[in-house]
Amino acid sequence: MDAKVREVAKGFEYEAKSFKAYDMNGYRFHTDKHTRERPNRRSINSAVYCLGTDGRHYYGTIEEIYELQYCGLQGVKPIVFRCSWLNPETVRRIPSIGFVKVERASKYAGNDVYIMAQQATQVFFLPYACTSTEYIDLLKWDVVYEVSPRARLSPPKEEDYEPHINCNALDAAISPTCRSTT
């Protein structure tokens, strides 16, 4: 049996480190309390997204960040986030335009509030900017914006590539094996 698996099977110590902020997956995550208490804050880094094992989309805020310390010499120290989740039944997705909105007042009643830090994607909740009484129903909804990881470029999508390259335009010395597609 792998030594790290054996160490995890023994269980974790009864002490864990707690953090106000933690860097993971190219994001800087903060607890919601830390975000609210910072004077002159310029960013809100406590909102997260996670795809559940049930296939539902979970959005919420980080309440606590813990580093669990397992017994043994292997140094297994997983980071977990305790989150306050929004009710996944109220999430509205329009994949064709990449639009997601959530009802912030609708809280998830389940007990599974922990996720591994590696599972988290940072998001930002943007309230609708409308104040007109005509659109009063929109005021309870927030639009979800998925934050790009720092110092990482998003990988190109299939539609970013040209489907065919006209090799006649290429220098034969650079690509001698290329044949014309026309």
PLM regions: where:
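Terminal interaction-prone segments of large eukaryotic proteins
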Residues: 1-182
